[in-house]
Amino acid sequence: AHDKMPRFDRGVFLAPMVRSGALPCRLLALEYGADLVWGPEVVDRAIMGTERRVHPSTGLVEFIKDGKQVFSCHPIERPYLIYQVGSSTPENAAEAVRIVTAHDDVAGVDLNCGCPKPFSTLGGMGANLLTMPDLLCEILKAMRRAAPPHVSVTCKIRLLPTQAQTLDLVERIVRTRTIRALTIHCRTKPMRPREPALLDRFRDVAAHVAKVAQGKGQEETRV
């Protein structure tokens, strides 16, 4: 069993994406020196009701439902693997966390609050959570309660239209005392990858996270 949380204060990470980060990609990233790797976003209801199977010769772990693989991982990546959850309800998010942590398959769980794609936002997930901070924070609290103590909880957000709105949201998230790290995609919800990221806004957000975290005795919270 593993008893140490992953470290977010330094290193090279395979960042959380929505439809990228499957097992082959993660293993390749680790081979090239990644310190932590995020899996693809898996909607909470997709992992619920799955059967966990372990391949006897390779050790491959698969979560299967209706004859299809929903998620796969391997013990070799366990200390570095962050499982990414798509959710819009605390109850379902907690159940998803319990399922993927029941056999100590992952080092951390991450709530996606940044995906702007319709498949995510139509269900109230992803970037839609940015405008529902109460719900977002309740989901994080539920995930923290459901996760074993040594499994980290993190989340990913996008920038809100104004810096003041972004700083307020970040402060509310940090004050939940649930997260070890916050990933910030430096684009707003309507922006697409071809548009330059708003990197000039990152410094103030990072400084605000550090200030709030220190005030709450959470010096370990990273951005």
Task: Please tell me what each predicted stretch does.
Residues 1-223:
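Flavin-dependent oxidoreductase catalytic cores
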